[in-house]
Amino acid sequence: MTNMKLKFDLLLKSYHLSHRFVYKANPGNAGDGVIASATYDFFERNALTYIPYRDGECYSSETDILIFGGGGNLIEGLYSEGHDFIQNNIGKFHKVIIMPSTIRGYSDLFINNIDKFVVFCRENITFDYIKSLNYEPNKNVFITNDMAFYLDLNKYLSLKPVYKKQANCFRTDSESLTGDYKENNHDISLTWNGDYWDNEFLARNSTRCMINFLEEYKVVNTDRLHVAILASLLGKEVNFYPNSYYKNEAVYNYSLFNRYPKTCFITAS
């Protein structure tokens, strides 16, 4: 993974030398806020300047590159916002770099714009899918960790001691696999949900709140990907459950398995 991380850093830096970056954070819940926060941290750490995307602004198809925030928004049949945004704006930019994502469907978008896209996948199922659309590894499709792993974790910590036993943080939305009610549940990812994350201060404060909540617990039970990632980064015991499609297990297999031994994936019975 170190080599892939290096390629991720270097590729963005190589484009940055001769192009202006225009960043559009992925809309969504507080997990998408974590992705945005980590992206801002990544930009700062690598001295990558950018401007936020704004409706009505004029962009150059010669010099501007759209950086589309990663995540799980490009899932045909579940979410359309990311697809529609890219479809409506791709002609304004020299390239569109899709930050680490899980992608399902929307084949026409990717086939018809193969010369415009550089796609970073965050797990192998998406990587294999994008390759099947004639994208070439190390040219216009890459694989790396979810952006949350690029978070500058220390600046979000409260360092409060652990004094609570376990937190249940299960989905209460359409990505829940079972829809079952969980006792004493805290779906903290839904504290915010919308197109908010171009505001880096809001993104970071939301992320800080999620981390500060999780810091107090010894065990975290969740089917929320970014709750599982944050809890793993914090060294918690994590029981990680499937969502309604392959995303959770695929990211677990690529980025969490064998790296965070206190995180276990609980397969559906």
Regions found by a protein language model. Name each.
Residues M1-S269:
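Active-site anion-handling motifs in enzyme catalytic cores
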